[in-house]
Regions:
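N-terminal low-complexity, Pro/Thr/Ser-rich intrinsically disordered segments
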Residues: 2-35
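Second-shell loop/turn segments in exported
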Residues: 23-28, 100-108
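A cross-family detector of function-defining hotspots
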Residues: 9, 34-84, 108-152, 158-164
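A short, hydrophobic secondary-structure junction motif
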Residues: 70-73, 98-102
C-alpha cells in the first residue's frame, strides 16, 4: 500500500510530446508555427478574435483566439524578434480542450478522475484560487493544467510562457 502511494506521489518527467495533441488526425503542439494550413487542419473554425497585447519585458505580444467545436487554439507572435521572424508570424501559444474526444499525449481526457490524472502525471502542483481547483505540470517554458470539479477533469489547458 505504501509503495503504491509513493509511486503515485513521484513526479513524472514531461517531454515535448506532452505538449501536443492530435486533432482531426493532425498533431498540434505548443510553439508550432500557425499557418493557413494548420488552421485548415484543425477543422471548421467557429470564430477568430483578437485577445489583446500581452506585455513581456520591454515588448508586448499579440494574441488571437481561434475557436473550434470542443477546443480553442491561441496564437501569438511570441519571440518573433529573437527567432528573427516577421512580426506578423504566429505560433501556437495555448491549446484548451473542452471535450472528451481529444486526449493528452498520455491519454488523459475530460471526465477522467483526479486519481487517474495523478497515476499518469504524478502530484504536480495545485492551485485553488478563484474558486477553481487546478493541478499543473511544468517543464522549462511550458505548462499542462487540468481543472477539476468534484474529482473529475472538466478542462485541459496547455500554455507556452511569454518568456520562451
Amino acid at each position: 500500500m505504501a509503495a503504491a502511494a509513493a509511486a503515485r506521489a513521484a513526479p513524472v518527467e514531461l517531454s515535448e510530446s506532452d505538449f501536443a495533441v492530435a486533432i482531426n488526425n493532425h498533431s498540434f503542439a505548443l510553439g508550432e508555427r500557425w499557418s493557413e494550413q494548420t488552421r485548415t487542419q484543425a477543422g471548421t473554425q467557429i470564430s477568430e478574435s483578437f485577445v489583446g497585447d500581452v506585455p513581456a519585458g520591454e515588448t508586448s505580444y499579440k494574441y488571437y483566439q481561434h475557436r473550434y467545436a470542443g477546443f480553442d487554439i491561441y496564437t501569438a507572435n511570441l519571440s518573433w524578434q529573437k527567432q528573427q521572424r516577421d512580426i506578423d508570424s504566429y505560433i501556437i501559444a495555448q491549446i484548451t480542450i473542452n471535450v472528451p474526444a481529444i486526449r493528452t499525449a498520455r491519454g488523459i481526457a475530460i471526465g477522467d478522475t483526479q486519481n487517474v490524472l495523478i497515476d499518469t502525471y504524478g502530484q504536480g502542483t495545485t492551485d485553488d484560487s478563484d474558486g477553481q481547483h487546478w493541478r499543473s505540470y511544468e517543464t522549462k517554458n511550458k505548462r499542462l493544467s487540468f481543472q477539476l470539479e468534484h474529482g473529475r477533469i472538466i478542462h485541459i489547458m496547455m500554455t507556452l510562457d511569454t518568456d520562451s
